[in-house]
């Protein structure tokens, strides 16, 4: 859990720095930076999506995961949670829910979140999560300057999501082979790609609704 705790702390520190710098950065500059990050997110998504080999498993996982997530309204649930936090922290502004949802997806859905958490739970090595912490802390500064304090609240999402994967890793060790992790990385990277498209304003995909696909690909890998 140490790696995940450090990761959450880095996001909070990055958010604090972003809030301090926010007033001095023109809106057009933060908008340009956000689009730049969006393009980088797209690149990361495309790169990671090439990890998988079982295309059929990915397609079925994405379709079934999207159906399950939509039925459960996961994206809406995240937005409602963001709005609830927004009401509790009125100073966060009307964009708090957007910052919370966007940052949570960026920090949780990526390959490093899954693989790093698994590595932490299976081997006790936190190196990948430490690297992710540095990257997340830097991006939190920029994201906060554009989206506000909601970005900092995503640290809770990271703590819960990555912490759960780390704790469950020991129990799932027999089935989480390198090949299975590669398929999970592939699906997660597809979601990162979709998020990047949202960030540059090309699409409005409800990415959170597809998160179950990351875990559905595990049984599908062995069945197909």
Model-derived regions: residue spans:
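Helix-loop-helix junctions within the multi-pass membrane cores of secondary transporters/permeases
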Residues: 95-171
């Amino acid at each position: 859990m140490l790696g995940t705790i450090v990761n959450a702390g880095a996001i909070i520190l990055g958010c604090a720095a972003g809030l301090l710098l926010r007033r001095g950065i023109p809106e057009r500059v933060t908008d340009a930076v956000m689009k730049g990050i969006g393009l980088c997110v797209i690149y990361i998504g495309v790169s990671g999506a090439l990890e998988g080999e079982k295309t059929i498993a990915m397609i079925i996982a994405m379709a079934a995961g999207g159906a399950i997530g939509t039925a459960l309204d996961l994206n809406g649930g995240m937005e409602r949670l963001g709005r609830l936090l927004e009401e509790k922290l009125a100073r966060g502004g009307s964009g708090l829910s957007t910052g919370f949802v966007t940052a949570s997806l960026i920090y949780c859905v990526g390959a490093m979140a899954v693989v790093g958490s698994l590595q932490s739970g299976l081997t006790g090595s936190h190196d990948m999560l430490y690297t992710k912490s540095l990257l997340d802390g830097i991006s939190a500064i920029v994201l906060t300057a554009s989206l506000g304090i909601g970005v900092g609240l995503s640290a809770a999402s990271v703590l819960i999501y990555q912490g759960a994967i780390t704790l469950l890793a020991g129990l799932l060790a027999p089935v989480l082979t390198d090949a299975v992790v590669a398929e999970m990385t592939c699906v997660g990277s597809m979601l990162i790609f979709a998020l990047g498209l949202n960030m540059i304003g090309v699409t409005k995909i409800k990415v959170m609704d597809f998160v179950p696909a990351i875990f559905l690909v595990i049984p599908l890998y062995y069945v197909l």
